[in-house]
Regions:
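Residues lining hydrophobic/aromatic ligand-binding pockets adjacent to catalytic sites
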Residues: 15-208
């Protein structure tokens, strides 16, 4: 039956690798970072493959993160690059959305896309990559909670992947935190959605 996420998961806080099977997916946002700082963060976390989940893999204000420029910089650092448009954002919400817990229409649209066969296929492809090497998924936002990669992280969690979010200061060593499931998410098996939350009534006021 349905259950709140905190009753389902004991979120693993450490990423482990057993043999050639990697149990952890990483996430990162490029923001306005210099390319050398960004690549340093990937190297600090042992990333061998960067999966770009931007819908449009270029940046007018940060040209170092255009697809061709980024792929060349990663190649020089012996890190592979792959663009997965099938996991990109900018999805439209449905009129009959079951994800009304998201007031942000962009996040709701992506959550609606997560209900489709296309997303399920793309997620399986991503998880297969994670079994081969250390993978980080990348989008543009500096922090995951402002980015659709946080929803991808949720989907990975319900599919028994540990997910760590990498945070990168403009100077200094990167650090990472375990990704935790969105608080209002609901889960049934590997199905994930974000229903509208009940509105609590305001406390009554005694009028003299």
């Amino acid at each position: 039956m349905f259950a709140w996420h905190e009753n389902i998961f004991a979120i693993r806080t450490v990423c482990l690798a057993i043999g050639s099977i990697h149990l952890c997916m990483l996430t990162i946002g490029h923001s306005t970072l210099p390319i050398d700082i960004f690549i340093q963060a990937l190297q600090e976390n042992g990333v061998a493959l960067l999966v770009d989940v931007r819908t449009i893999p270029r940046s007018r204000h940060n040209p170092q993160f255009g697809m061709e420029e980024l792929a060349a910089s990663l190649h020089a650092a012996e890190i592979r690059y792959r663009w997965m448009q099938s996991l990109g954002g900018l999805r439209h919400s449905r009129k009959d959305s079951i994800n009304m817990g998201w007031h942000n229409t962009s996040f709701r649209g992506y959550a609606d896309y997560m209900q489709t066969d296309a997303f399920a296929t793309a997620l399986k492809e991503l998880m297969a990559l994670d079994e081969e090497t250390t993978v980080a998924i990348m989008c543009s936002e500096a922090v995951p909670w402002r980015c659709h990669r946080s929803l991808i992280g949720d989907a990975l969690l319900v599919n028994e992947h540990t997910v760590d979010d990498i945070f990168v200061p403009t100077a200094g060593k990167s650090h990472r935190k375990p990704h935790t499931l969105t608080t209002f998410a609901r889960v049934q098996g590997t199905r994930l959605w974000y229903p509208e939350q009940p509105t609590l009534p305001l406390p009554s006021r005694n009028v003299p």
